[in-house]
Amino acid sequence: MPHTAEQWNERYRGAPCDLPREPAEILAECLPLLPAGPALDLACGAGRNTLFLAGRPQSVTAADYSAAALEILESRARAAGHPVERSSVLAPPHGPRGAIRIAEVDLERARLPENSFELILCFQYLQRSLFRGMEKALRPGGFLLFETYTRAQVDPDRVGVTHRKDFPSGPHNPNYLLAAGELRTAFPTLETLFYRELRAGKGIATLLARRPDL
């Protein structure tokens, strides 16, 4: 899996036509529960989840380190008629619902604005230093939907899988993989609404959590 911005750029420039357009399955399933206020899509990639929310319509700030991925997102967003603005600030976009703010940022060093978003998405990305900031960036009553890979990806025997090929996606470095049960307790100030950890056939953990009202 790529690590540097240039490696990610090469990946996105190499196969833009093959990139998925459908949202993450869990996002589509949870949509009726999720607030429609300003959203933040961390490590958005080419923006399949950003565009899904913007079509709701919902204002979305889409953040990623790859300029190439964000170029694809901007092209798709403009083609769909969404207002687009570029910024290095991780704040809600200006403009009507359906507007998208595209932010090219290094998430390893990013600071999230407090009490700014009603919904935060984080898919297939793990940066533990962001966890406290993600909690604080939610407005009271705001939701976090988080899904990424676990260490079952590199320890398949523990879950009854005999070949690494059964886990074709995700990083190999354990530092970028969740330990068993880690995501369940990663956001102690939030109320867990749903948690799932798949170990047979997939090494993925999913969390839907909510910041309590004041």
Model-derived regions, located:
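Conserved SAM/SAH-binding beta-strand->alpha-helix loop
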Residues: S66-A68
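A short acidic, Gly/Pro-enriched loop at the edge of an enzyme's catalytic core
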Residues: A110-L119
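Conserved class I S-adenosyl-L-methionine
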Residues: M1-L34, A36-G45
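Conserved beta-strand signature within the Rossmann-like core of class I S-adenosyl-L-methionine
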Residues: G142-Y149
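Conserved SAM-binding strand-loop segment of SAM-dependent methyltransferases
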Residues: H82-V89, G95-L107
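A short, conserved alpha-helix within the catalytic core of class I
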Residues: L126-E135
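Conserved SAM-binding motif I beta-strand of class I
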Residues: S59-D64
